[in-house]
Amino acid sequence: LLPIVGNLLNSLL
């Protein structure tokens, strides 16, 4: 879950 959330945040940023 952590890696997935990190990837989503990085995609938005």
UniProtKB/Swiss-Prot annotation:
Positions bearing Leucine amide: 13
Tissues of expression: Expressed by the skin glands.
GO biological process: defense response to bacterium; innate immune response; killing of cells of another organism
Compartment(s) of residence: Secreted
Cellular component per GO, a single term: extracellular region
Alphabetized UniProt keyword annotations: Amidation, Amphibian defense peptide, Antibiotic, Antimicrobial, Cytolysis, Hemolysis, Immunity, Innate immunity, Secreted
Family assignment from sequence similarity: Belongs to the frog skin active peptide (FSAP) family. Temporin subfamily.
Function: Has no antibacterial activity. Has hemolytic activity.
Protein name (database record): Temporin-1Td
Native source species: Rana temporaria (European common frog)
